[in-house]
């Protein structure tokens, strides 16, 4: 296992994703600041946060548990991004780039989960 969560590619890519999500949601309507914008940002932040928390437990079982929470947050984030596009808060090219990042993090996360011994 990595010495520190910052060494994990999954965490690094998730942090990049959060930065991208914050930039995307900056253009959302102000009336959504405490609603969809907040939900999207929380879901995004949850991904690297759970990776870090899980790695800090030093147990493969607990690490896997927190990684699965991260995967759940990715599904939540994907749904919310699609909703934002449907509502006209972001155009397809903008959400498509963010969704590609979400899928990339998901693939890396699934690989990390699969690599952990039972």
Language model regions located:
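Short, C-terminally biased terminal segments at protein or domain edges
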Residues: 1-118
């Amino acid at each position: 296992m990595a010495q520190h969560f910052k060494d994990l590619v999954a965490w690094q890519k998730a942090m990049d994703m959060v930065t991208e999500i914050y930039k995307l949601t900056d253009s959302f309507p102000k009336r959504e600041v405490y609603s969809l914008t907040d939900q999207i940002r929380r879901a995004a932040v949850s991904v690297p946060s759970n990776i870090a928390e899980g790695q800090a437990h030093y147990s493969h079982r607990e690490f896997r548990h927190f990684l699965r929470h991260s995967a759940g947050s990715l599904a939540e984030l994907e749904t919310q991004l699609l909703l934002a596009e449907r509502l006209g808060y972001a155009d397809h090219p903008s959400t498509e780039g963010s969704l590609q990042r979400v899928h990339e993090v998901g693939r890396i996360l699934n690989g990390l989960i699969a690599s952990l011994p039972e």
